[in-house]
Amino acid sequence: MNPVPMPASNALSKPLLPEVEAANAWHDAELAAALVAVLRHKAGGIRVCAQPGPVRDYWLALLDSFTETPARRVPSNTPTERLLGGMDITESMRYGKPVLAQGVLAECHQRVVALSMAERLPKEFTGHWCAALDTGEVHIARDGISHTSPASITVIALDEGIDEESPPAGLIERLGLSIALDEISIRCVDDSRYARSDILSAQSRLSHTTVPDDDLTRLAELAASMGIHSSRTLKFTVDIAKALSLLSGKPVSDE
């Protein structure tokens, strides 16, 4: 049974992959959704390169079915005062002291956030998203208010960019996963290989799953040989390998 309704067609701007390749690409995208659901903020999130259409909608609905909480859509042009929060004028006047109006990032604590048109995220707002991904918090210090709120978020960066358009590099490097959907036909989208119970089972065992020291060393050496020296990237790789192991039933070293 399909986890979500399947649309009838898909409008794509890129040539479609051959059927077998497209089916494999969809299975990879499906696995990526399961990994995001298992890891949440541990993976930062995922970059989804795709134009609006039924395949992207189906993938987002699939992720919602894995998390059982719909992703909250946040436009990329959401300003600082709405992202971080600020003084609630009405309540401040009522109580005669500064009262905080919670921002979007704090409202989305422990939730999945779909950042619409991430390729157009203004530079002046990028730092707020990156800080929340780095620390799991947002800090506000203005209008007589100094407050830190939890903001552990999982970001789905919806990248609709064409040609040279791309989300800010600082955001991309904080997302552990990336998929592209535009070359997948809706006809190649099939039933999910994973269920909500698989996600919950993997989550419950994740903290008890370890990567052997030898494998960690090999991963670090491989990353260095490829010119990758980011500890964040290495951590993403380790966490993703553990989640893959739990979803596939294979040893971590195989992943």
Language-model-detected regions and their locations in the chain:
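Conserved ASCE/P-loop NTPase catalytic core
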Residues: 2-182
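An alpha-helix initiation/capping motif
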Residues: 53, 57, 217, 235-239
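Alpha-helix initiation and N-capping motif
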Residues: 56, 80, 196-199, 216, ...
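Alpha-helix N-cap/helix-start motif at coil-to-helix transitions, marked by capping-box chemistry
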Residues: 77, 209-213, 235
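Short, well-structured alpha-helical interface segments that form or flank functional binding sites
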Residues: 124, 170, 214, 232, ...
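Phosphate-sensing "switch" segment of ASCE/P-loop ATPases
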Residues: 146-226
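C-terminal helical "lid" subdomain and adjoining coupling/linker elements of P-loop NTPases
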Residues: 222-255
